[in-house]
Amino acid sequence: MRYLKLTDKKNNGQLVFLDKEENEYNIIEIKNKEYSLKYISLVPYYLENTELYDEYVELTEEEYFLELARQLAKEYHKGQVDKAGVDYFSGHITSVVNGVSTVEEKIVAYLHDTLEDTELSYLDLMVLGFSDKVINGVIFITKDKKESYEDYLKHVKSHELARAVKLSDLTNNMDLSRLKEIAEVDKRRLEKYKKAYKYLKEQD
């Protein structure tokens, strides 16, 4: 598999991958909280006498999916704000990403609220090529509205990626210094988060 990020003015930052079955390149367009996969010819990027020559960078598989997760989170969470009134992507999402270590953890961190708070579904993540491990991590960290918080935490704890990301998520949510005013509901929520954090840190 081959992965690229285009750097020309028109398609700057857009991701391209080689579809082995069709033996053709597809560009992923992400805008207006939607994504699409379209065929793209890379011939102009290889011809020295064109403006597009060499206007791309090669990405590893890890770099590609990390950047794809970042772009999806940024677009699909657009217009949302966190409890501190800060842009959701640059605030909460980025803090959670910075709180984990591995590339897989960071990918799940970027996507950890997409199934609950955006129109993205796990089927979309499958279509976009994310690994089963990453998709399951996102599913496990997404709370089903019908399940209790206790059952939810059990599910999170059973998946290593979901657990690592949830600990980072809780760490950010417990930081009351980011709030302009601290209400009683915030204090109650903090106690809930502290108990959840302790539970997830405990070794079974």
Predicted regions located by residue number:
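Short N-terminal binding/cap micro-motifs at the start of the first secondary-structure element
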Residues: N12-L15, D82-K83
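A short beta-strand micro-motif
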Residues: R2-K9
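Acidic, low-complexity, intrinsically disordered interaction modules
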Residues: V16-Y53, E105
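Active-site helical microenvironments for divalent-metal-assisted chemistry
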Residues: T60-D204
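Residue-level detector of beta-propeller blades
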Residues: K5, L52, E58-L59
